[in-house]
UniProtKB/Swiss-Prot annotation:
It comes from the Bacteria. NCBIfam families: rpsL_bact. Keywords: Methylation, Ribonucleoprotein, Ribosomal protein, RNA-binding, rRNA-binding, tRNA-binding. This is Small ribosomal subunit protein uS12. GO terms for cellular component: small ribosomal subunit.
Length: 124
């Protein structure tokens, strides 16, 4: 325990919280242009071809974003919206693509959890 005199001379230093999503710069989402759309394999013990894209954001950052859902229409030069949220089994992927916004279509034939995949309510 520090004495009062020691604390007067050198006060306690606050810990600075580090952001998990630095490229968003405290915004909820950011717009960007796809520079590369590709698949990659997850860490052990999982096995799949995960759809991801490299995105150049409006603030100059270049990040990797995960494309959730079954099937997508993204290609190079597509304009997309990204949000925060990492993919645990893909190292370096800290962002998700927002489905149903800008050039990214919603998931086709999706009936449940539609809001997460940009799908409108089906007609009765």
């Amino acid at each position: 325990m520090a004495t009062v005199n020691q604390l007067v001379r050198k006060p306690r230093v606050r810990k600075v919280a580090k952001s998990n999503v630095p490229a968003l710069e405290a915004c909820p989402q950011k717009r960007g242009v796809c520079t590369r759309v590709y698949t990659t394999t997850p860490k052990k013990p999982n096995s799949a071809l995960r759809k991801v894209c490299r995105v150049r954001l409006t603030n100059g950052f270049e990040v990797t974003s995960y494309i959730g859902g079954e099937g997508h229409n993204l290609q190079e030069h597509s304009v997309i919206l990204i949000r925060g949220g990492r993919v645990k089994d893909l190292p370096g992927v800290r962002y998700h693509t927002v489905r149903g916004a800008l050039d990214c279509s919603g998931v086709k034939d999706r009936k449940q959890a539609r809001s997460k995949y940009g799908v409108k309510k089906p007609k009765a």
